Amino acid sequence: MEKKQLTQKEELKQQFIDRLQLDCSVSPDEASDSQIYQVLSAMMVQRLKHMRQHFVNKTNSIGGKKVYYLSMEFLMGRSLKTTLYNLELVDDVTSILNDYHININQIYEQEPDAGLGNGGLGRLAACYMDGMATDGVRGTGYSIRYEHGIFKQKIVEG
């Protein structure tokens, strides 16, 4: 007997249910918005890691170089929403959540501010990182992690 090939949406839904059960011991109907956010984020991280490994292997095989980008801040925006959009999964995930009467916008709201910047420099750095990803350039962004949140800059007698 042949095993039925699942669609991308069916696979995602099964992963979602399984991860909620394994990681949080709840069903989708019982899960809090925070638990759903954590599970969806973990699912996307796993997908991105697989894609990254494939990309790294490919660039290494052709002798590709790597860019290291240093900035005081990165204003990346909401990672879950951006990742779902970039992986073309917004419609599937929205539909899966709708099956359980869950509003995806409430899940997006669970994401904490990364605290990596608040100005034009941070937005520019994020655009450079997006551009590298879009163009297939292997790169990593480095910044300072502030212990007490985003800093304020003030020029005194200058």
Residue ranges with predicted function:
Residues 1-158:
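A conserved ligand/cofactor-binding region detector
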